[in-house]
Amino acid sequence: MYRFFVNEKQENFFILTNLTLNHIKTVRIKNENFICVYQNEFYLVRLVPNSNKAEIIEKIKGNNEPKNKVVLALAILKTKSFEFAIQKAVEIGVNEIWPFYSKNVSQKLSGDLEKKLKRWEQICLHSAQQSFRNLIPKINLPINYKDLLEQAKNFPVKLISFERAKNNINIPDNPQNTIIIIGPEGGFDDVEIQQAEKLGFQSITLGKRILRSETAAIFLLTKCIKD
């Protein structure tokens, strides 16, 4: 069953945006019921013919969000890899995504950053709809590595992936809010790791094999997110 996030409710109807209406037209929804997600809750609805409204049939109970908040701080990657990581992170259950620049980031974003952010937000939206999320994870404009560490220092669990780390993954059994930092293709240098460790980050290895950044993000998210 198709699902769409909506922001406006009038009495027993949701107001659908032109973007949502175009999607509904593309998938040829006419008489079939579908689901609207409004303020993190699910509603079974039907389209009102020749209008921009969906009539509410009933509210559906359900919470598909993880027990803990997990933030993915991901270094800027090549466009295809970065967008793939966003998509899969949302499907797995990430709460927020913080893009960042570090020393070895080779991919420099050019052009209109706000336009790129809009595209990332659309990926988050479509992935959240596809995976039946109650909310759309937030993704931010890129920040530098130093600012990232400062913003992340108060998380109860702070992990940074580093191929030369001696520690294996040790995730607490009880769900806790967590931030994980995944570096660029060139990894982190020793100074960057030391900066993170001074603020309480645990540097961890993901195993004997070197993973691509997008693969490392998926692997670590599946370990940290608690359903």
Swiss-Prot record:
Entry annotated with the keyword Hydrolase: no
Single GO cellular component term: cytoplasm
Localization: Cytoplasm
Gene: rsmE
Superkingdom as given in the UniProt entry: Bacteria
GO biological process: rRNA base methylation
Role: Specifically methylates the N3 position of the uracil ring of uridine 1498 (m3U1498) in 16S rRNA. Acts on the fully assembled 30S ribosomal subunit.
Reactions accelerated catalytically: uridine(1498) in 16S rRNA + S-adenosyl-L-methionine = N(3)-methyluridine(1498) in 16S rRNA + S-adenosyl-L-homocysteine + H(+)
Top-level EC class: transferase
Coiled-coil positions: none
Keyword Transport: no
InterPro entries named among the record's database cross-references: Alpha/beta_knot_MTases, RsmE, RsmE_MTase_dom, tRNA_m1G_MTases_N
EC number(s) per entry: 2.1.1.193
Entry keywords, A to Z: Cytoplasm, Methyltransferase, rRNA processing, S-adenosyl-L-methionine, Transferase
GO terms for MF: rRNA (uridine-N3-)-methyltransferase activity
Major site of localization recorded for this protein: cytoplasm
One Pfam family of this chain: Methyltrans_RNA
Record-given protein name: Ribosomal RNA small subunit methyltransferase E
